[in-house]
């Protein structure tokens, strides 16, 4: 259950010093380069589960979707598709639990105004590890900076451990 609840909070890590542009939507900083996306997502996620998500809403385009993929013990793939508002409601139900996401490693591919980020992450709730996994993030460059168009997440499981090349 925790894996499903928190796997959306994937990505990020500290990329201090990344130049930021101002978002027209909520006054939140949008990354000026794709390498700033993980830190922007991390900053928007980290904190109390019931915190204001205005910066997360500014970072994702309104049509963005989040897909959470999991493998059953029998190896069967299942997925859940959510809007950002769906995710916010689900996470908010955790109350004041402190969420902290840390990026382990990431790789970026970019062509013009589109980018794809492949990111491994570790998620903690109230200081305790609850999930690790991989994020696949798609982004687009707009006038104010880079925004996320979609996030696909698969949390680590007994049948799909995180490969060593994605660990620190």
PLM features: what roles do these ranges have?
Residues 60, 70, 119-121, 135, ...:
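A mature extracytoplasmic/lumenal domain signature
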Residues 22, 65-66, 78-129:
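Surface-exposed, charged secondary-structure patches
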Residues 41-49, 60-64, 68, 88-91, ...:
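Sec/Tat-exported extracytoplasmic proteins
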Residues 8-16:
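Bacterial N-terminal signal peptides
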Residues 1-9:
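Bacterial N-terminal signal peptides that target proteins for export
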Residues 132-160:
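Short beta-strand edge/turn micro-motifs at domain boundaries
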Residues 2, 21-59, 166-168:
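Short, low-complexity N-terminal intrinsically disordered segments enriched in polar/charged residues
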Residues 56, 64, 117, 139:
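Hydrophobic pocket/interface hotspot
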